[in-house]
């Protein structure tokens, strides 16, 4: 294993990135300055030397920022990242092609070395946390007890959502025979309000949605094509691979390639129980919902298999599955880079998902509609509303959520850092 150090060198909200020379391994990719720890050196000594050789500066090495291991095909790297301050000199590209002081947003647009992606993610997490704490902010989740198509539009308007360009509206088309899914007539006003295309993906297991031909017939039968343009994102191969270098379980996610045709996404979720995930909401729509049929196998297996024929033979341990869903959801959130909005409707509250041909009837009375720009917060709020309910059927729903460790998906998503479990519930 190769011991490597890197430096997080800041100037206000910006930090220094270096572009590797074209002729070197991973040429033209951007990275944090640093290098190998030589025999006899401490990590701090190595970092001081590397900054002197690479950048022509003297630094004061501060606290440890992050420690990680990254496996390249040719070598495994153990990387320790330190914060540091400039003591003297101005950074120069002595061993790099170029240097650039960037914000986290600007860094996210650059091609980063794979081992450096987790460093950027940690910077983003801390910046978001610090900003929210500094302003006493929590993620806003809007809530209404009135469940109507018109109210859905009102909830979306409350978000002032950044849905620009070509908008995808992710729905659940409903398995054939399922009586609980939300019909296209319910979603029609909000989809039309943003001029969206309804998008879906094929399933991995047998049913009416596991091939493009069958799924298209079902979409027509359920009325989706009557009202909207509809796009099966994985109708044609190859899938689009979204990298997850810092994933808890997955290192990549496989989504329908046509997701590339959209600039933003409106995620429309029917909150309910789920036989495998404990519950289904925004995080499930982002993960399993946006995954291609092979991508669904990949998530359910915890990154072991994409073989649809052996789907049920490769089911991951439950916590790994929940973490894989969180990994996959985070990759889609990062892909759209903030251009997303989430609506969860808590009606037809069965313990079973809309993917079940034979689903239990609702066990609880309807609760309401929630809206947020934070997929973690909106799912946490739905869970909290279930637990706070005095409905006699609450126990059945809670048992389903807890027996499948459903909240662990939310915990994992918050740990990854693309949303927060802390929220402010604003009732409209």
How would you name each of these model-derived features?
Residues 11, 58-60, 66-92, 98-104, ...:
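Active-site-adjacent beta-strand/loop module that shapes the phosphate/pyrophosphate-binding cleft
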Residues 115-131:
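Charged phosphate-binding loop/patch that engages nucleotide di/tri-phosphates or the phosphate backbone
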Residues 11-13, 60, 87, 163-165, ...:
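Short glycine/proline-enriched coil/turn segments at helix->beta-strand junctions
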Residues 14-53, 57:
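Conserved Nudix-box catalytic region and its N-terminal flanking loop in Nudix hydrolases
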Residues 1-15, 36:
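Conserved N-terminal beta-strand and adjoining loop/helix that marks the start
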Residues 17, 81-83, 99-101, 285, ...:
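Conserved hydrophobic/aromatic beta-strand scaffold that supports enzyme active sites
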Residues 7, 43, 47-51, 64, ...:
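Hydrophobic packing within well-folded, soluble alpha/beta domains
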Residues 136-189, 193-428:
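Extended, low-polarity segments enriched in aliphatic/aromatic residues
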């Amino acid at each position: 294993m190769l011991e490597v150090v890197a430096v997080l060198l800041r100037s206000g909200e910006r930090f220094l990135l270096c572009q590797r020379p074209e002729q070197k391994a991973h040429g033209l990719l951007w990275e944090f300055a640093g290098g190998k720890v030589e025999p006899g050196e401490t990590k701090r000594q190595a970092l001081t030397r590397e900054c002197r050789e690479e950048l022509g500066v003297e630094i004061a090495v501060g606290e440890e920022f992050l420690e990680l291991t990254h496996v390249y095909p040719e070598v495994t790297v153990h990387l320790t990242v330190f914060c540091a301050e400039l003591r003297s000199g101005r950074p120069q590209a002595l061993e790099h092609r170029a240097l650039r002081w960037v914000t986290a947003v600007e860094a996210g647009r650059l091609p980063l070395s794979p081992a450096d992606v987790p460093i950027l993610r940690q910077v983003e997490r801390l910046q978001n946390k610090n900003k929210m704490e500094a302003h006493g902010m929590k993620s806003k989740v809007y809530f209404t007890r009135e469940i109507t198509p018109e109210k859905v539009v009102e909830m979306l308007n409350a978000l002032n959502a950044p849905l620009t360009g070509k908008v995808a509206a992710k729905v659940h088309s409903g398995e054939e025979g399922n009586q609980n899914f939300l019909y296209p007539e319910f979603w029609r006003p909000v989809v039309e309000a943003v001029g969206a295309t309804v998008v879906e993906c094929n399933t991995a297991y047998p049913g009416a949605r596991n091939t493009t031909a069958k799924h298209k017939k079902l979409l027509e039968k359920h009325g989706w094509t009557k009202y909207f343009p509809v796009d099966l994102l994985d109708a044609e191969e190859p899938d689009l691979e979204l990298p997850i270098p810092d994933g808890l379980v997955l290192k990549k996610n496989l989504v329908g390639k046509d997701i590339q045709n959209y600039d933003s996404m409106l995620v429309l979720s029917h909150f309910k129980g789920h036989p495998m995930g404990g519950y289904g909401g925004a995080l499930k729509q982002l993960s399993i919902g946006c995954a291609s049929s092979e991508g669904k196998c990949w998530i359910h297996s915890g990154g072991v298999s994409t073989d649809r024929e052996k789907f049920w033979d490769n089911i991951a341990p439950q916590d790994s599955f929940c973490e894989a869903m969180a990994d996959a959801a985070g990759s889609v959130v990062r892909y759209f880079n903030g251009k997303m909005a989430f609506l969860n409707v808590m009606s037809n509250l069965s313990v079973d998902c809309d993917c079940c041909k034979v689903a239990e009837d609702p066990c609880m009375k309807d609760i309401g509609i929630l809206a947020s720009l934070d997929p973690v917060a909106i799912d946490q709020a739905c869970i909290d509303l279930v637990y706070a309910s005095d409905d006699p059927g609450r126990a059945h729903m809670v048992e389903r959520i807890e027996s499948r460790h459903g909240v662990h998906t939310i915990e994992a998503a918050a740990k990854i850092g693309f949303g927060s479990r802390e929220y402010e519930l604003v009732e409209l």
